[in-house]
A protein has these predicted regions:
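Membrane-embedded alpha-helical bundles that constitute the cytochrome b-like, heme-associated redox core
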Residues: 2-163
Length: 163
């Protein structure tokens, strides 16, 4: 038992603990840009669905539906994993997770993006309610994401001030 406990309490080098705190914010800024790109792709899909004739043919050639699905899938996976990574790094560095608005809104963003992705089977069947709900949820996600960027910068500034 003592051997198992010593393995669980491996010492993490201080430099790793310090620099690991910056992984989450860097990834999140990339994901914010990715989310905006996913919105652009989604709007192009909607535009192609409503277009007619040559305009529709040109839009279909852009394969926006495939790109949107792929970008959305990567966004879902990386956003979810990165949220848990951030909590783990915070716990390793401070021995606790700070219960504040940044954590709560971050968990809401993860919950909303998972809910949005769960609408895919309904959207593939052409259900407009699912498409509209998907768009509405993701506009909300982008708004919360922007707010998270602001509070995240404040968190990073606090970390830097303590170095």
């Amino acid at each position: 038992l003592q051997e198992k406990l010593s393995i669980m309490s491996l010492a993490i080098p201080e430099s790793v603990k310090v620099w690991s705190q910056f992984i989450h914010p860097i990834i999140m800024w990339v994901l914010l840009v990715t989310a905006i790109y996913a919105l652009y792709l989604g709007l192009k899909i909607r535009q192609s669905r409503n277009a007619e004739g040559e305009a529709k043919k040109e839009l279909i050639k852009g394969r926006y539906n495939i790109k949107h699905y792929q970008v959305g899938s990567v966004l879902l996976a990386v956003l979810t994993l990165n949220a848990f990574l951030a909590m783990a790094v915070t716990y390793v560095n401070h021995g606790k997770i700070f219960f504040g608005s940044h954590l709560i809104v971050g968990l809401i963003v993860v919950s909303l993006i998972v809910t949005s992705a769960s609408l895919s089977p309904f959207m593939q069947r052409g259900n407009m309610w699912a498409r509209n709900l998907h768009l509405a949820i993701n506009i909300g996600v982008l708004g919360l994401f922007g707010w998270q960027a602001i509070t995240g910068v404040q968190v990073v500034q606090k970390i830097i001030s303590q170095l």
